[in-house]
């Protein structure tokens, strides 16, 4: 295919997004201060980019389905059958939610199960909106703190032992490892979590 098409991405207005960076980047008016969290340029079925053609705008995923080799090339079309990545621009103003990504095998099983159950692809209670395992690459355009994974168990045990505000968590970690500790902390009400975090912040400042 020798034709170049103009793509129009899709804005995602999640609560945690900022309200200036993406509108300024994409020359979009945002006088009301609506959050612009993400800008998607891809073929995800829930929000495919729009392709400007001579016949009007069309969804990128539909065009790929009609002519996969023309849009993806023979090798990618044969291996994936669709665009194998989703390019996003993020403007993170508030803390993001904690995410757990499935393995490729679990993603395929979960997606198939929800498809058979007839759950709409955009249903808010749906877990698997595609059958991919979500490996990610992040390129920071400004200062950005990202927490990824967990330290080794012995290192965390030493940390819980050495920091007085965390001593009460030692028995929980000793009994149920990371799963129990994480579950316990996520179920704390805000005041209880703050009682643990505030002394840690004070130590960090010192």
Task: Outline where the language-model segments fall.
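Transition-metal
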Residues: 1-206
